[in-house]
């Protein structure tokens, strides 16, 4: 890690290894879009977080693949990456799972939990919802706007990510807004979590999977 201070102390590393990475099954790719833009104030921090959590001493199941937002334009467009820093979690998920910004604060354990799900393929949703999500035949984009201090945000992010686990037509995005004031104003985010489905249906507040499903149907009408 060179000269920079470690973000995770020994105790946190132990918790990470025992409580999270011990559950990993298949390899997970963390696809990270860095940027050379000096305004990308959190790009270096996100890279450090990803490097520390995928330390080979903790697990051999995580692989970081770094791309450049400005140079890797074709891939960026193919994956629909709109800003940097962005991290895509790739494993047993069928749809795209993206995290924009810094996975810190209340979002950090949820980010780790997502990596575990993507590694094992486990989906925590009621059976009838799983069937409905798997049956969706049109593209669905779910944006969940969050902050690192919001207690209810991780649950909403988790639900949207579980939907993306199940269907290749779904992309679920968490937007941690501290680095994206322009995005916050573009979407009129005043309270978090705020959810926007297909740029069409939106609401504030964490909701159960049944409600999210209903809103997706509404957005597809």
Language model regions located:
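Structural micro-motif
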Residues: 73-91, 97, 186-198
């Amino acid at each position: 890690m060179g000269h920079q201070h470690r973000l995770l102390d020994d105790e946190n590393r132990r918790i990470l290894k025992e409580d999270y990475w011990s559950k990993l099954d298949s390899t997970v790719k963390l696809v990270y879009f860095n940027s050379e833009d000096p305004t990308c104030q959190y790009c270096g921090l996100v890279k450090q977080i990803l490097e520390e959590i995928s330390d080979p001493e903790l697990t051999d199941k995580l692989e970081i693949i770094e791309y450049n937002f400005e140079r890797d334009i074709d891939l960026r467009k193919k994956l629909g990456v709109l800003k940097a820093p962005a991290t895509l979690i790739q494993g047993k998920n069928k749809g795209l799972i993206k995290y924009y910004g810094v996975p810190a604060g209340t979002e950090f354990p949820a980010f780790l939990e997502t990596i575990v799900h993507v590694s094992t393929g486990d989906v925590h949703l009621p059976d009838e919802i799983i069937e409905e999500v798997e049956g969706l035949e049109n593209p669905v984009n779910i944006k969940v706007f969050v902050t690192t201090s919001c207690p209810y945000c991780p649950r909403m992010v988790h639900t949207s990510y579980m939907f993306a686990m199940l269907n290749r037509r779904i992309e679920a995005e968490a937007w941690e807004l501290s680095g994206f004031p322009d995005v916050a104003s573009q979407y009129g985010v005043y309270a978090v979590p705020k959810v926007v489905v297909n740029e069409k249906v939106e609401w504030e507040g964490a909701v159960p999977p049944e409600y999210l499903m209903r809103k997706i149907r509404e957005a597809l009408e």
